[in-house]
Amino acid sequence: MDKKEYINRLNEQKPLQEMXSRDRYLXNFHLIP
């Protein structure tokens, strides 16, 4: 999946209160196979 799809899935899975954590996942995006 590409980066946009990955971000969209994070947005769907994570509540707004955890948006911060989204930045940590983005930072680790290169770890996604």
UniProtKB/Swiss-Prot annotation:
Q: Where is the active site?
A: 18
| Keywords from the named record | Carbohydrate metabolism, Glycosidase, Hydrolase
Q: How does activity depend on pH?
A: Optimum pH is 7.0.
Question: Where does this protein act, in terms of pathway?
Answer: Glycan biosynthesis; sucrose metabolism
Catalysed reaction equations from the record: Hydrolysis of terminal non-reducing beta-D-fructofuranoside residues in beta-D-fructofuranosides
What the record says about the induction of its expression is: Induced by sucrose.
Q: Where does substrate bind?
A: 15-18
Q: Does the keyword Hydrolase apply?
A: yes
Tell me its EC number(s), please.
3.2.1.26
Disulfide linkages recorded for this protein, renumbered to the chain, are: none
GO BP terms: carbohydrate catabolic process; sucrose metabolic process
By sequence similarity, the record places it as follows: Belongs to the glycosyl hydrolase 32 family.
User: Which protein are we looking at?
Assistant: Sucrose-6-phosphate hydrolase
Q: Which organism is it from?
A: Fusobacterium mortiferum
